[in-house]
């Protein structure tokens, strides 16, 4: 959608309760349209199961949590965002000039952390319990990511 911002919440997991089959269609997806250029003052999204896609959003303060599901952030920016998942992968795709300014803290118990080479953070591994962490210092927004069993990907365009 040229000139439109939208937010996609997949509620396809509900189809299992009705059909006994997992199914994702336009009928079981919640899409929130927000006027272009608007910034969310506060965002709180919590799901038990299902994927979350945020596209072209600006969030001042937010928490996004899912127990089981992947999260996709495309061309988003924020001042303070905390992302937490028990089982699911996290993908951040954005512009290099925006992502390089973020203060990022990533912690994962069982999962990989893949970071674009242009980002200048530091990867650390705890050899005793195999935890991975990644830290980047910047002058922009603060991003805190915690996952128990999932991969984290930070990719610049």
Where are the language model's segments positioned?
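Short, surface-exposed interaction patches in beta-rich subdomains
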Residues: 73-157
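Right-handed parallel beta-helix
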Residues: 1-65, 70-73, 129-146, 151-157
């Amino acid at each position: 959608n040229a000139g439109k911002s939208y937010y996609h919440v997949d509620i396809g997991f509900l189809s299992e309760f009705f059909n006994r089959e997992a199914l994702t269609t336009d009928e079981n997806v919640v899409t929130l349209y927000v006027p272009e250029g608007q910034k969310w003052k506060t965002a709180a999204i919590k799901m038990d199961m299902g994927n979350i896609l945020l596209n072209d959003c600006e969030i001042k303060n937010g928490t996004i949590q899912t127990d089981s599901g992947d999260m996709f952030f495309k061309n988003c920016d924020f001042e303070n965002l905390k992302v937490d998942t028990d089982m699911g992968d996290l993908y951040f795709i954005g512009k290099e000039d925006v992502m390089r300014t973020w203060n990022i803290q990533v912690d994962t118990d069982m999962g990989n952390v893949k970071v674009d080479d242009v980002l200048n953070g530091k990867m650390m591994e705890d050899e005793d319990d195999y935890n991975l962490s990644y830290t980047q210092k910047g002058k922009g927004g603060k991003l805190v990511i915690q996952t128990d069993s999932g991969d984290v990907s930070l990719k610049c365009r």
